[in-house]
């Protein structure tokens, strides 16, 4: 019905996993893929009650990451199980034209982030180690597409063969917690809230078991390991040996379930410090066809007032204390501000507009192409040097993404400054290279 019904042309019901009928003929549906609660009237018409696309004031901002169940109580209140956010939501669907009674605040990360200090996945677990990748960075696919996906975790560098240690006491809950690409670069183990990638699960580089009670190595007739079995219910404690790093020379650590990944930098790792401000290499504008604006009037970039929405692009990167000089990390948040020629903000831009924030992993399959402009890519997964060109006029926050753009027609003709906000997770902000003088006419 979601794909063919004329009343549902945008596929509102795609990924429908929960349904609740009411006494007066309405039906409420939880759309897991869309992150929405959909209302179907007795006449069969669809509308979005809550989540992205809702028209009721306040309801569009409700942070539904992965609604998986829904129920209506005897008083008409609607309860939503948001599996990806570890939360139960409540709203009154009878007053959907106003903010719901149970106004939903931003979801909280898993409780384990309160563990202080939080151990690293290598020895010494309470020492310090180099972070070489953060959430939200652009990644390619090894096959020519440089903006294939966004990086979902925290990369921590160590040589191939280093033993990976569990960072929290957890119990395996998934019946298939480890990936099937045995010996591959992306071999993975997910215990519960923590996922470990780029390691040989449960064994050394020469396929010797690390812990036979937890990891059962299945061998063929020639004695080669063909499968590693990890039983559901297996318990791991902090410091337990769970694998060894493969030739990727780092472990990729993810926090949260597949559709609810939280930025692992919320974990209070000991010895992790960052006093290095991000760097902005360049700021430029792209038109609707992806062409770069390059005409100038003196020192100002000439911007056609009626040329339509533009992409504001900032090439930027970051480092942490102790990073190698060649290291290029991604930003935690970015945005922009429009200033008058005298440096005062125009109306609506009294503060920088934060448009990109990697607190949670974006869910859209095209998120990398929304966040990053062409020419972005990384040196490992793409045939180029690492470059991150952020489209700060688009939207990517709290797991949601959208193509937005900036329309110069909203301003009177004249001289302005586009000022970029580029910040890391520790609050350091780029101060140089952030301004682009423009003339709108």
Language-model segments: what does each one mean?
Residues 15, 33, 66, 84, ...:
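Beta-rich catalytic cores
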Residues 98-195, 202-207, 229-232, 237-241, ...:
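Surface-exposed, glycine-biased beta-strand/turn segments
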Residues 231, 273, 288-441:
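Long, low-complexity serine/threonine/glycine- and acidic-rich segments characteristic of extracellular
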Residues 21-24, 72-75:
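Residue-level detector of Asp-centered blade-edge/turn motifs that repeat once per structural unit
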Residues 26-29, 77-80:
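Conserved beta-propeller blade signature
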Residues 40-45, 92-95:
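Short loop/turn segments that connect beta-strands within beta-propeller blades
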Residues 32, 83, 93, 201-202, ...:
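Short loop/turn segments immediately following the C-termini of beta-strands
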Residues 1-15, 44-68, 98-101:
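Gly/Pro-rich loop segments of beta-rich domains
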